[in-house]
């Protein structure tokens, strides 16, 4: 639908954008705010640090338990989720749906889905799932869940107002992350 409905050449270099009336109006409303771009960039790095932390946790389980078969199934599922994020990213870098609404110095760059939004939402929502299962202290559990939720919310809102993606690209990142999370949960609890 993104490449069929209301497609118009409103992007840089006359690039075609789906849902052009909606995307164009929202982009004109918000403009470009590189401060929010930088803030969400830092939050994305924080999300990657969380993913690395779970990778180290899996390595710790392997060393402590002495066997690949003794590493928790949900940690393997988490590794699968992270690989799936990478595959989706590469897929949409090759099968371009929309280009960014602004030229960031590298010419036309793919914008759908907002990979930053997808990555942050996937990592943080899977972290929430892990923390709810693993943290015994209710206060610490609630704090980590709140922090993860805040990182996701600020990333989504920040990417919306940064102006480096079309609105539908950010929505696509959120929807793809929700889909990937459902596959992760199904694999983790089997």
Segments and roles (model prediction):
Residues 105-190:
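Membrane-embedded catalytic cores of phosphoryl/pyrophosphoryl-handling enzymes
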Residues 1-111, 118-146:
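Hydrophobic alpha-helical bundle signature of multipass membrane enzymes
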């Amino acid at each position: 639908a993104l490449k069929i409905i209301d497609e118009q050449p409103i992007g840089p270099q006359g690039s075609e954008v789906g849902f052009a009336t909606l995307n164009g109006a929202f982009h004109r409303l918000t403009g470009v705010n590189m401060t929010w771009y930088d803030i969400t960039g830092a939050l994305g790095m924080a999300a990657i640090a969380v993913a690395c932390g779970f990778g180290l946790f899996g390595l710790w389980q392997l060393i402590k338990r002495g066997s690949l078969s003794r590493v928790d199934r949900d940690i393997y599922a988490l590794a699968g989720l992270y690989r799936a994020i990478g595959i989706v990213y590469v897929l949409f870098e090759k099968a371009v749906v929309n280009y960014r609404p602004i030229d960031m110095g590298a010419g036309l760059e793919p914008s759908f889905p907002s990979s930053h939004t997808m990555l942050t939402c996937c990592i943080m929502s899977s972290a929430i799932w892990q923390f709810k299962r693993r943290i015994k202290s209710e206060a610490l559990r609630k704090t980590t869940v709140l922090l993860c939720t805040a990182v996701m919310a600020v990333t989504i809102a920040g990417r919306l107002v940064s102006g480096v993606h079309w609105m539908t690209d950010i929505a696509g990142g959120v929807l793809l992350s929700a889909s990937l999370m459902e596959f992760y949960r199904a694999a983790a609890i089997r």
